[in-house]
Each structure stands twice: as C-alpha cells, then as structure tokens.
Amino acid sequence: MGIKEDNWIRKMAIEEGMIEPFADNQVKVHPETGEKLISYGLSSYGYDLRISREFKVFTNIYNSLVDPKCFTEDALISIVDDVCIIPPNSFALARSVEYFRIPRNVLTVCIGKSTYARCGLIVNVTPFEPEWEGYVTIEISNTTPLPAKIYANEGIAQVLFFEGDSACDVSYADRQGKYQKQQGITVPFV
C-alpha cells in the first residue's frame, strides 16, 4: 500500500470526480482580494481540503453528559458565517467544501494543518474508507483557555491517499455504512 502523488490525485479528481470542486494547486492568496489564506488544494502527496461556512458549536446548556450513543442536536448551536469562534476547551463540527468519492482500492488518512495545530486547535477526521463518498464532517477541538477563530473557505486538513495492492472484498458502500453520501454536518449516531 503506497501513498499517492499529485499526478494521480489530479487524474482521479478530473477524470473520476474523486474531489469536487478540485483546486489543481496550492491556493495561498485569495484570487480577488489578495488576502493571505490558510492554504488549500493539491500538494505533492495529498490534498488540503477546505472548511465550509457551516458550523455546529458545542454547548453544555441542555446537557450534563456527552454520550455518543445518545447525542442530540440540542448539544450544538448552528452557525453559518465566514468565521467560527470556538469557546475555550470546547469543540465545533463542520463540513468540507469538497465532496469526495473514494475508489474501491483506496483508503485516506486526514491530518489537521499545522497552522491550526500550532495555535492549539486539533482537527480530527476518521479515514475515508474504500467507496465512501460525501462531504467530510470535521471535528475541531480548541485545547486552549481562550476563544479560537476558524476561517471558512480556507484550508483545515490534508488528505493523504493510500492505494492498496488490490481492491478490498467489502467496501464501505457494500456494507451500507451509516455516513455514506452525507450532505451536511452529520452528528454521531448508533
């Protein structure tokens, strides 16, 4: 199982629709305003995905316990904006701008960008399994004692693509995975 390079990622995105929309290079400056951005787009051995304007920020107003088997929407406040402020020692859920379609013989690993990590913000995304498709639900934890700002439509994490020696026997689509073809921010459910 080897990591895939920029040429392969570009070909799969353009010819197979693996990433939509697809930025064919590292975008570091806003094309219209000239403002510096947290980079996104194609890199040497990965793809830096962007975070959309949709956020769900955790609140403890209605809950005294976080239970992944019984997680309710009232534990989150929905926000649509160009930035999201995450309270100290809290977290937010968001989704990617890009829609992914993962081939049957590929597994991805997603790693948070160092720009945010160096500010005490941890990005967590589980692997995209073979034949999973959808918008990515992203979890961002603010480990600091201060509020933290996240910028929409800018880079948040890098996706690394690993191609297996052969296709798997049972893919995420075959077993009808519960997060298949998710369209928005999807909260946990069992």
Swiss-Prot record:
Subunit-level organization: Homotrimer.
Gene3D superfamilies to which the protein is assigned, alphabetical: 2.70.40.10
Function text: Catalyzes the deamination of dCTP to dUTP.
Catalytic activity: dCTP + H2O + H(+) = dUTP + NH4(+)
InterPro entries to which the protein is assigned, alphabetical: dCTP_deaminase, dUTPase-like_sf, dUTPase_trimeric
Official protein name in the record: dCTP deaminase
Protein source organism: Chlamydia muridarum (strain MoPn / Nigg)
Family stated for the protein in its record: Belongs to the dCTP deaminase family.
Positions that bind dCTP: 113-118, 158, 172, 181-182
